[in-house]
Amino acid sequence: MTYFVLFLGLCFVLGGLAVASNPSPYYGVVGLVLASVAGCGWLLSLGVSFVSLVLFMVYLGGMLVVFVYSVSLAADPFPEAWGDWGVVGYGVGFVVVLVVGLVVGGFVGSLDFGVVTVDSVGMFSVRLDFSGVAMFYSCGVGMFLVAGWGLLLTLFVVLELVRGLSRGAIRAV
């Protein structure tokens, strides 16, 4: 179980690296899906199934819509893949920064691996993450509205950035 959680953590970091290394949007969406699946699987293996499901729906429902619009509007004749020198340079730079941060922070020698689940203290009649479901929908209404408007604003910003000088449907004939 510990190795599985470490594998999911590694997949999460590699997925984030695949998005952050600035490939073409065609390839960046694959890194986003890998990171979201690995992160939600990581939470699921630790016993937080409801929060994992909510985050998975937010990631795939919100951010993938933005990436789909970016891919549809950014028609590159020669898209940058992960094997191009610029993307590989970004990836190597991120890995070097991560390793230097781990060494300087002193985390390399003191890595104790262990897995602790959410309800490992004893037997509960209701799991701990399901007790927060009511809080999501009662006190979290404002947060959901702000997050929805934020995703809509992000969609419009990405559409405006990708559109360029073509002026969309409002063009002078």
Curated annotation (Swiss-Prot):
Keywords: Electron transport, Membrane, Mitochondrion, NAD, Respiratory chain, Translocase, Transmembrane, Transmembrane helix, Transport, Ubiquinone. It is an enzyme of class 7 (translocase). It is a multi-pass membrane protein. Pfam families: Oxidored_q3 (PF00499). InterPro entries: ComplexI_Subunit6, NADH_UbQ/plastoQ_OxRdtase_su6, Nuo/plastoQ_OxRdtase_6_NuoJ. Its main location: mitochondrion. The keyword Membrane applies. GO terms for molecular function: NADH dehydrogenase (ubiquinone) activity. Coiled coil: none annotated. The chain crosses the membrane at residues 1-21, 27-47, 48-68, 87-107, 139-159. Its EC number is 7.1.1.2. It is found in: Mitochondrion membrane. It catalyses: a ubiquinone + NADH + 5 H(+)(in) = a ubiquinol + NAD(+) + 4 H(+)(out). One of its GO terms (cellular component) is mitochondrial membrane. Belongs to the complex I subunit 6 family. Core subunit of the mitochondrial membrane respiratory chain NADH dehydrogenase (Complex I) that is believed to belong to the minimal assembly required for catalysis. Complex I functions in the transfer of electrons from NADH to the respiratory chain. The immediate electron acceptor for the enzyme is believed to be ubiquinone. This is NADH-ubiquinone oxidoreductase chain 6. It comes from Aethia pygmaea. The gene is MT-ND6.
